[in-house]
Amino acid sequence: MFLVKKIAVRIRGIDTPELNDKREEIRNIAIKAKEELEKLFNSGNKIILYNLGRDKYFRLLASVKVGDIDVAEYMIKKGLAKSYDGGAKVW
């Protein structure tokens, strides 16, 4: 028997725009970011979480790889995320 529970994990080192942002151009980037992450996570490659910790709000935080792809670097290169160190929001 398997017990399955969804757990939200924030990707270490990046900030993506909010889907409910008032600015349409930012919302469009947020939608593209969500779609790109879904595509990446559903690719069938192994998902690896490492460097686990908690952010300042105690949310689960991890570095993430899908296959050989570092997800944070990938999203930044695609222009769908910005580098983030836990300080002020960057969008």
Indicate residue ranges for each PLM-predicted region.
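Small beta-barrel nucleic-acid-binding modules, primarily SNase/OB-fold domains
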Residues: M1-W91
